[in-house]
Amino acid sequence: MASEKSHKVHPPLHFILFPFMAQGHMIPMIDIARLLAQRGATVTIVTTRYNAGRFENVLSRAMESGLPINIVHVNFPYQEFGLPEGKENIDSYDSMELMVPFFQAVNMLEDPVMKLMEEMKPRPSCIISDLLLPYTSKIARKFSIPKIVFHGTGCFNLLCMHVLRRNLEILKNLKSDKDYFLVPSFPDRVEFTKPQVPVETTASGDWKAFLDEMVEAEYTSYGVIVNTFQELEPAYVKDYTKARAGKVWSIGPVSLCNKAGADKAERGNQAAIDQDECLQWLDSKEDGSVLYVCLGSICNLPLSQLKELGLGLEKSQRSFIWVIRGWEKYNELYEWMMESGFEERIKERGLLIKGWSPQVLILSHPSVGGFLTHCGWNSTLEGITSGIPLITWPLFGDQFCNQKLVVQVLKAGVSAGVEEVMKWGEEEKIGVLVDKEGVKKAVEELMGASDDAKERRRRVKELGESAHKAVEEGGSSHSNITYLLQDIMQQVKSKN
């Protein structure tokens, strides 16, 4: 802590953090809260009671260590919008029908939050809000304080969205959803289909109104915090910073603030496996021999595809950990595993985690040599930070952009071969995109002994080392937190 004290800011700034209610958005925001508090700022996190419970243990340890972090609860108006009680996080829903009322309920938090802000002591200096909570812009305007947007994705994807929003005619002129187009004015030559990019061109009604409000709130914000580091995507950090008139702070990988084993194990939620049991299993395997498989907290693959994934892992003859989140939704998968003998056949070299996994803890273990991921930005960054090459299996959102960065630009992974977006409600119709032979082939390509595989491992190990240097004192991300604190302090002083 001695090195951090030299950077503390006095009098302390007070940051109000608004994480969106989705695991992939909340987890890095909690890490950001700890990073700011370690540098002397007071931090208040505003969320609902149910969501606060997900990171209670991690924050309790942070507070007990003396970090000035507070949590303030607001009531989630589930009844008004016909939502089930206790389902206050987007990963609790598996149908698009409830998404619009969920977002409407989230937007209704504006009034109670406004009242909270009026009573808050010390006076807030700055809001850091998730992109998906545009109402926080009104609050920032009312209290005349800067609002910084947190996206939860990297600069490659942010620049891609920025460029395409200014060239919508490219998307509108495509004759088919299967046609590829070239992203204009981009540092690298990259191509996508229209469904693969997170830029909406056909929204209507309430959903379009929300998206328009979100984009406006983003572009009128004071600046952007990004969970990335300059050495990972230098051209994209540079161009996106230029596009946002300089107010972009790359402060990642924020997951590296989790140094204690307990913090790594409980990051985001209570793990569905005992930490010691997991480590004991990993300790029994050779270095670099285990493939970690996790397709995120909102994985919506159909049963037919999950069976092929399991059979492909079995055929690869590699040791693996397979995480199946939302396990309660997969009774049929469990029946298949038992009746077909799958669980019995793989018990010596396969570990199934049925629920939330201690991902950072697993990825930082020397036995792990590969990561099959849905390419959510947190997972992508956690894999690279741990020096682990990736098999990319994107589902939706920013994940196809992240795949392109990993495979084509960074050359830190191989694609499983998925080209079609997994649309909510149409999973069964889409069916199997990668069969067991395709899974086996991707695992062999990643974990094998070819020159390409060796070069990929060398490259990603180098990126992992750069990530750790970035967050150390004097590193790019550590310095960017200093610049952020100095900037907000100047804003506070100019108003006094």
Curated annotation (Swiss-Prot):
Source organism phylogeny: Eukaryota, Viridiplantae, Streptophyta, Embryophyta, Tracheophyta
E.C. numbers: 2.4.1.-
Compositionally biased region (Basic and acidic residues): 451-472
Residues reported in the UniProt entry to bind UDP-alpha-D-glucose: 297, 357-359, 374-382, 396-399
CDD domains named among the record's database cross-references: GT1_Gtf-like (cd03784)
Gene3D superfamilies: Glycogen Phosphorylase B (3.40.50.2000)
A Pfam family matched in the record: UDPGT
Protein name: UDP-glycosyltransferase 73C4
Domain of life of the source: Eukaryota
A GO molecular-function descriptor: glucosyltransferase activity
Disordered: annotated segments: 450-475
InterPro entries: UDP_glucos_trans, UDP_glycos_trans_CS
